[in-house]
From Swiss-Prot:
The active site is at residue 200. HAMAP family: TrhO (MF_00469). Catalyzes oxygen-dependent 5-hydroxyuridine (ho5U) modification at position 34 in tRNAs, the first step in 5-carboxymethoxyuridine (cmo5U) biosynthesis. May be part of an alternate pathway, which is able to bypass cmo5U biogenesis in a subset of tRNAs under aerobic conditions. Residues 146-240 form the Rhodanese domain. It comes from Escherichia coli O1:K1 / APEC. GO terms for biological process: tRNA modification. This is tRNA uridine(34) hydroxylase. PANTHER family: TRNA URIDINE(34) HYDROXYLASE, UPF0176 PROTEIN YCEA.
């Protein structure tokens, strides 16, 4: 029986990936469709992906699939063909190709079965996730941005919005997608006569959000097909002005794709213009925050003097200090509302 999970250490896998000579292509895709047995589907896809040397993060549920992956360049078309042939619902599926890609986004394949491919917190039995808003293409997005009757709603987290967003887009002040959905409905109650345009990184969150808005009585709802990634790609291909400002945060080792030259965020330590996310080097912290090169050198990649001092201690002493301690030494917030308790790159489904 084939092994259907990874058994090699992360360090060894990362070293192996970095030693590869063949370029890789970072791809993301999702599809809402009924999967009768997600576990069986997961195991079959794991074997297919492994055979093509695909790395990345894949979630499956009864409601569909959500994937961010890295594929050897020579296998991209084979991967596309085999994915399309895997299930009739996947035939012709749009694959979002990364805009700013060094090929080092993932080094291991992790494929999990979950209750939902996006944690939405919706338990209304009458909610129809297929009753989504209308898709917008790049040219239509730009036209909507100039329409005084249109409101753009950013369905991403604060740390994503902070480094890049569409002109005049509204941020929904919440820590997770499940918290954003009811807040979006609440914030838009006074604007039901407006055209509501929703967007996210690759389309999966704003598609479900558009259905939720319609479920709650909003009739003029649109969402950007393929999210920021597809919008920027098509706008560039068609010679259109790219109206997204700054960087598009992505959930892999790159932590961002440069969309425009503007830097709209600031270093969380000194306030200098900067939009480079990093994780605190202290193994007892790993906070996601924005750090400029000057502060990275000053604090040795840590988020604070406390973490800098602790990370310089012998490993045994670091472990002793961490034992039984809540993450009370974290200085900055990943979001506006609470301290980050997630190590490493955030989960895009939250």
């Amino acid at each position: 029986m084939p092994v259907l999970h990874n058994r090699i250490s992360n360090d060894a896998l990362k070293a192996k990936m970095l030693a590869e000579s063949e370029p890789r292509t970072t791809i993301s895709f999702y599809k809402y469709f009924h999967i009768a047995d997600p576990k069986v589907t997961r195991d079959a896809l794991y074997q297919l992906f492994t055979a093509l040397n695909v790395f990345g993060r894949v979630y499956l549920a009864h409601e569909g699939i959500n994937a961010q992956i890295s594929v050897p360049a020579s296998n991209v078309e084979t991967f596309r063909a085999q994915l399309y042939a895997f299930d009739p619902a996947l035939e012709g599926l749009r694959l979002n190709i990364a805009l700013d890609d060094d090929g080092k986004s993932f080094w291991v394949l992790r494929m999990k079965v979950r209750d939902r491919i996006v944690a939405d917190g919706i338990d209304d039995p009458h909610f129809d996730a297929s009753n989504v808003g209308e898709y917008l293409q790049a040219a239509e997005v730009n036209a909507m941005l100039d329409d005084p009757d249109a409101l753009f709603i950013d369905m991403r987290n604060h740390y994503e919005y902070e480094v890049g967003h569409f002109e005049n887009a509204l941020e929904i002040p919440a820590d997770t997608f499940r918290e954003q959905l009811p807040k979006a409905v609440e914030m838009m109650q006074a604007h039901k006569d407006k055209k509501i345009v929703m967007y996210c990184t690759g389309g999966i969150r704003c598609e479900k959000a558009s259905a939720w808005m319609k479920h709650n009585g909003f009739n003029k709802v649109w969402h950007i097909e393929g999210g920021v990634i597809e919008y920027a790609r098509k706008a560039r291909e068609q010679g259109l002005p790219v109206r997204f400002i700054g960087k598009n945060f992505v959930f892999d080792e790159r932590m961002g794709e440069r969309i425009s030259d503007e830097i709209i965020a600031h270093c969380h330590q000194c306030g200098a213009p900067c939009d480079s996310h990093t994780n605190c080097k202290n193994d007892g912290c790993h906070l996601l925050f924005i750090q400029c090169p000057v502060c990275a050198e000053k604090y040795k990649g840590c988020c604070s003097e406390i973490c800098c001092e602790e990370s310089a201690l012998p490993p045994d002493e670091q472990r002793r200090r961490r034992a039984g301690r809540e993450n009370g030494n974290k200085i900055f917030n990943k979001s506006r509302g609470r301290l980050n308790t997630t190590l490493g790159i955030p989960d895009p489904t939250e």
